A protein has these predicted regions:
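Mid-domain alpha/beta scaffold segments of enzyme catalytic cores
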Residues: 1-193
Length: 193
């Protein structure tokens, strides 16, 4: 995945094993992630997580997720978390890892109770393409995401990052420039580049 610094055009990389792409090369890929982390070639680990739509059993996904979380923790990197119908399992994994690293809930689109649970556990919340739909769950809860935990993404959608910023800023009742400043501060705090 790519991590792009707001307003700078600089591109940094994350590396992870997405739950949809678990195969027989997992050990080799984990070694590559660890090597990239050790050599400072990535700024985060992920996407990593649990997706109940994936072919791999949830138990296999969880074990792999926990191993990637360990790598992130070992090298002091944030973890970009993918979760589909598996938030309780991810929060349990967070507690089990006793992680002091920052975890980013990628592509958040869930109800208020889930948002509050993630926030209680220290997660950052990344809003993206789902925020463009005024009927979506994330659109409804956007004003409730604390400014110091908010990130913006596109996740390769048909929307530009500018469009997502515009929609999120309108929903929160702030100027796009203010939202860019908020995200920049969060980005700097998370990635320490």
């Amino acid at each position: 995945g790519n991590v792009i610094m707001p307003g700078q055009g600089a591109v940094y990389f994350s590396l992870g094993i997405h739950p949809m792409y678990i195969d027989d090369r997992v050990e080799e890929r984990l070694q590559k992630i660890e090597l990239a982390a050790a050599e400072g070639k990535i700024v985060a680990v992920g996407e990593a997580g649990v997706d109940r739509n994936a072919l791999a059993p949830v138990e296999v996904q969880l074990k792999l997720f926990e191993r990637q979380a360990e790598i992130a923790g070992q090298y002091g990197l944030p973890l970009i978390v993918h979760g589909v119908r598996a938030i309780p399992e991810l929060i349990t994994a967070y507690k089990k890892c006793r992680s002091h690293q920052k975890w980013i809930m990628h592509g958040f689109n869930n109800r208020r109770e889930i948002l509050m649970d993630l926030l209680r556990h220290g997660f950052y919340i990344s809003a993206g393409r789902h925020a463009m739909n005024e009927e979506s769950q994330v659109y409804r809860v956007l004003p409730e995401i604390p400014a110091d935990r908010l990130l913006i993404e596109t996740d390769n959608s048909d929307f530009t990052i500018g469009e997502v910023y515009g929609q999120v800023a309108r929903r929160r009742g702030i100027a796009v420039e203010e939202l860019q400043h908020i995200v920049r501060m969060n980005f700097d705090r998370l990635f320490k580049l």
